[in-house]
Structure formats: structure tokens, C-alpha cells
Amino acid sequence: MAMPRNLPGQAAHDEADQEILRLDGIRKRFPGVLALDGIRLDLRRGEVHAVCGENGAGKSTLMKIISGQYLPDEGAVHYRGAPVRFRSASEAQAAGISIIHQELNLVPHLSVAENLFLAREPRRGPFVDTKRMNAEAARCIARIGLNVAPTTKVGVLSIAQQQMVEIAKALSHDARVLIMDEPTSSLTEAETVQLFRIIEELRADGVAILYISHRLDEMAQIVDRVTVLRDGRHISTDDFADVSIDDIVARMVGRTLDDAYPSRQSVPTDDVLLDVRDLRRDGVFGPVSFALRRGEILGFAGLMGAGRTEIARAIFGADRPDGGTIALHGRPVTIRSPREAIRHGIAYLSEDRKKEGLALPMPVAANLTLANVRGIASRFGFLRFDDEIDVARRYVQDLAIRTPSVHQRVRNLSGGNQQKVVIGKWLYRGSKILFFDEPTRGIDVGAKFAIYGLMDRLAADGVGVVLISSELPELLGMTDRIAVFHEGRMTAILDTKHTSQEEIMHYASGRSHA
């Protein structure tokens, strides 16, 4: 995926080395947490500057201060050579600082043009000047090479196209500083190449980009400098060409990670927990057959559209299959809903943990007990809140969930700790079969290692684990066997010890024999 680029620090203009943004001594406190402790950062025109750190390192808080969503408790922000104190995101945006969040901030039922000019529509008298708005939107989206009509509803666009709409929206505000939060997390390789092309063009126009990503390997293609944060502190800032990925990882976690994956302690038995035969959803997948053994981690590999998530959802009862059988512990079962699947000991950890795995406004304690409320209820049906707190504290300690208290709202936790809460929820339920769907997407290397360790511990305790992942090294590092899918069909089941990325991709592309 390599592409032509400027050398580190080399933008297209003489102004490239001119500082556009500087932060000095930034501190930010929340109840029970010092989120930022004396952070310093500078950003130059025409520069792509990566900010790296584990979840909880302070990246999101720092970006929210720069973009006007938070005020710092201490320290100074200088923008274009003058001290600033933005009191809202709209103030920062008006000054030329825009942020593109990982969860895109668009209105699906509105058109591209309406999203670009929401709350600032051009007017002719008391009426919106739709013709002018569409014309201006067309110019904005043409600048970034987005080939859609400005009247197209945003909801019908792909994630990559929606992200380009967000970039066009920022440019319509004449953004000179653009913050990109995990911009490639939901993109295909081809879409990532397109995004990097746009970033190169923005850099050439003198736009300064703060780039947040856990995908360190892709940074070499576009990043000029990299700043590492840890526990709310500034650790280092370097030209990207002067440091290795191992250096960055070691600074992020405060130690060297000799192995990306833990030494496996689990050994699968011959006891079959889940036996799926000829399962199908017409037009979606199948027929598919496989078995999951006690203590096994079974991988699901495949390209986008291969049907991996759809198969898991059908087994979990979220989608109704059109045929096939499911047996648990040797006994046929009929699963018509997630409630029935949960009762049978099956859990599904969705790839979208925020929408489908957590109740974000609720505290950690309530989320941990959500799947097994009866476990903390009296015989009269009343919740015993002291028991809920005891259960939550046990899992917070056992899973090393970083939170100021079990009363903290789960939306305030980092992505890795949110994922641990989801796992804890199913552990408290006593689930014996767990489907992990992209469990490490959007979390840092240290949190990934912790999640891997939990998965192996579950398998060692006799749980059957299915790992759905788009990361082939993850599948090779964590599984016993790998089932490969292509367009809804299983093309192979491979012994992980005796396969390779090349063989997996061979079958994932639909070929039957390596």
C-alpha cells in the first residue's frame, strides 16, 4: 500500500516549518482522574503528526481540548501565534480547527449538501438557497475526489464515503488544522489508499493534520512526526523516520512487548460444545458446518462480505436461519432469539460494542451485571445493590478494568476497558460459548495483549471461543484452528500451527485447493 509522499517534515510550501498550533503544560482533571498532566505538543503547517498511546493515555481528552470541547484546567493553547481559549467546538471550527471522530457525526436522512452546511445553510431572504448550497457542496466534494451527487442521502453511502463527507465538511469551514481519530478503523485496504491520497493533498495545501491511530504499521506511509503519551503525560516527540514501531510500542506501554500474543495455556479437548450442521440463510451464507470443542479458540477468517458475522448472529439467535441444525453438548437445540441463546450459555460480543454490547449512560456495575440481573435479585425480585457492587468490584479486580470506581459511567472508559466490561458481563452470566467479533478493533497494543490473555484464560477454563477477525496475525497468534469463508461459503478449516497468511488468503479469495 506504499505511495509517493513527502519526506518527514517536508510539505509543499515554504511555510511547512511554521508552527500553527502549540500546547504548553496542559492539565485536565476529572473526578478521581488526572487525565492530562503537563502535556506539550506543537503542530506545523503541512504536517501529519501522529499522537500515539494506550487507551486511557489521554489522547481523546487532548483532542477535545484542541477542538474546543473541553477547557484545560491549566496550561496554554496557542493557535496561529496567539493564545486562544475555545469554549465550544463551534468556536474552534470557526477558527479553522475541525475534528473527524471515529464515530462519524453525520445525519443519515439528510443529503450530503445538507450535512455539509447544517445550521449554516446559505439563504436567499428567509429561505434556504438550495441551488447555491448544492453548488458549493459539489465544489467541496470535488476537491477531495468524492464522486457522489450533493443531493445523495448520506445514509446510503459507504463508511469510507461518509468519512470523505466529514473531510469535505471540515474543508468547507476552511480548516487549517484537521484532527483525525482512527480514520482507517472501518476502511478496506483500497479505501485506506484513497484516504491517504486525500491526506497527501491536504498536506500539500498546508493543512496540518493530527492523526490518531492504533495501526502503527500504516503510519510510515503518511506520518512526519509522532508524539507518544502515557498515563496523561508526554513521553516523546520524534521524526517518524528516526524511531521504530517497537520503540513506539515500548514507550506507549512503559515496557517492551517481547511477544504480541501470550503463551497459550489452553489445550482443546475432544468434547464438542457446539456442533453446527448445514446452517444457512438464503442469499446470505451457507450451508455451513463446523464444530467447536471445549477449550478451543476457533478463528473465523474472510474478506468483507464473507458472512462471518452473519453466521455468528444466526447461531446467537439475532437473525433467523432458513435451515440447518445446532447442537449443544450433543443435544439438538432450537434458538429463536438472543434470549434463548443466552439461556443456553452462548454469548456474542459484537464488533460494535458501544451500540450492541454496552449501556453507555449506565455505570460499570450495572453493565457488568446486565446479562444476569437475577444473580443480584432477592427472591421477591428486588435488586440487591450491595451485591451488584460486590460483583462489579470482583470483576474490575479480576479483569484489571481501569476505572475510578464501579460507579463510573461506562462511556467514560477507554475502548480496551469497555471491552473488558463486556467480557465481564458474559463471564458473570456463566457463558460457555463466546463469539468475539473483531474484539481488538480500535484498542491499543497493551489492551490487545490483555484481551488476548483473557481469551486464553477462558479457553483454559473450558470455554469454547470463536474469534472473528480481519487481522490475520491475530488469528495465527491466538487460535487452534481457522475456518475460512468466502461469500458465505466455508472454503477451508485449517490447523493454525500448519498454515500461513498466504494460505488463508488463498482460501479467502474463493479458491478451493492451495
From Swiss-Prot:
Family the UniProt entry places it in: Belongs to the ABC transporter superfamily. Carbohydrate importer 2 (CUT2) (TC 3.A.1.2) family.
Pfam families registered for this protein in UniProt: ABC_tran (PF00005)
GO MF entries: ABC-type D-ribose transporter activity; ATP binding; ATP hydrolysis activity
PROSITE patterns assigned to the protein according to its UniProt record, in alphabetical order: ABC_TRANSPORTER_1, ABC_TRANSPORTER_2, MGLA, RBSA
Keywords (A to Z) from UniProt: ATP-binding, Cell inner membrane, Cell membrane, Membrane, Nucleotide-binding, Repeat, Sugar transport, Translocase, Transport
Origin species: Burkholderia cenocepacia (strain HI2424)
Record keyword Nucleotide-binding present: yes
Secretion signal, residue range per the UniProt entry: none
Domain ABC transporter as annotated: residue spans: 21-256, 267-512
Name recorded for this polypeptide: Putative ribose/galactose/methyl galactoside import ATP-binding protein 3
InterPro entries (UniProt xref): AAA+_ATPase, ABC_carbohydrate_import_ATPase, ABC_transporter-like_ATP-bd, ABC_transporter-like_CS, P-loop_NTPase
Record function comment: Part of an ABC transporter complex involved in carbohydrate import. Could be involved in ribose, galactose and/or methyl galactoside import. Responsible for energy coupling to the transport system.
